[in-house]
């Protein structure tokens, strides 16, 4: 069961002396048919596990993961489960997979943040809607500098943790198709407008064709090294 799996992770956290256990609801596929029922199920699992988690002296950090929840939905989950033992692993890249401005995500979830995943994103308009692509740190147009400044101010003492994923082809969001909105029926217009503002600032930034002479491992290493270098240089200026 989900409770048994979480219990095993809590035991593992105690062994390695981790103060948190990261967990996820699912992915964007779980929005089909309504994300609400999955949120309710996760709240039930967390409530059933409350004593186990609190007795261990750890907290559960729920990630906004792979297009599953928008910020207001994850905030509601944390509040319903109990913020005394449930918080957030905030990912700066995943909001764009839910047509959400990452800065709005941070503003909404900052009080609950336990740790982070950070990577940059490029967003731009297309005839059908919008395109998004994850990039090396500093190479996107989402405003990573301001994001980190806000994170440090609103989440003092929390880790700046890089999760470097550089996309190949962009992910397309054809929001001009009425059927698209079946997945986002509860999204307020003002929230979506903030996402569009980021798209308006962008321009198409397709990924460079992979060099067949470079292995995927070497390419990933180069992405990580470039992202770490940029982040260290930026943090040194603060």
Where are these regions (language model features)?
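Active-site acidic/histidine proton-transfer and metal-coordination neighborhood
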Residues: 1-88
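Active-site-proximal loop/turn and secondary-structure-junction residues that shape catalytic pockets
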Residues: 25-29, 66-68, 92-94, 122, ...
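Active-site flanking residues adjacent to catalytic metal/cofactor-binding acidic residues
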Residues: 62-63, 90-91, 119, 162
């Amino acid at each position: 069961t989900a409770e048994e799996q979480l219990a095993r992770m809590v035991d593992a956290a105690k062994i390695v002396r981790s103060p948190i256990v990261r967990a996820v609801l699912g992915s964007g596929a779980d929005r089909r048919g309504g994300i609400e029922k999955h949120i309710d199920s996760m709240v039930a699992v967390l409530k059933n596990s409350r004593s186990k988690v609190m007795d261990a002296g750890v907290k559960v950090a729920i990630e906004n993961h792979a297009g599953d929840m928008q910020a207001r939905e994850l905030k509601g989950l944390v509040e319903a489960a109990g913020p005394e033992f449930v918080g957030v692993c905030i990912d700066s890249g995943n909001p764009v997979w839910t047509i959400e401005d990452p800065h709005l995500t941070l503003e909404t979830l900052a009080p609950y943040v336990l740790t982070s995943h950070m990577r940059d994103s490029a967003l731009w308009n297309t005839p059908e809607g919008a395109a998004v692509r994850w990039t090396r740190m500093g190479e996107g147009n989402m405003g990573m500098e301001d994001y980190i400044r806000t994170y440090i101010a609103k989440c003092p003492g929390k880790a700046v943790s890089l999760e470097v994923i550089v996309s190949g082809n962009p992910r397309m969001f054809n929001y001009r198709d009425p059927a698209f909105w079946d997945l986002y029926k509860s999204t307020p217009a003002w929230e979506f407008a903030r996402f569009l503002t980021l798209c308006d600032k962008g321009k198409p930034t397709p990924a460079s064709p992979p060099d067949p002479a470079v292995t995927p491992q070497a390419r990933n290493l180069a992405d990580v090294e470039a992202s770490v270098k940029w982040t260290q240089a930026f943090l040194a200026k603060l």
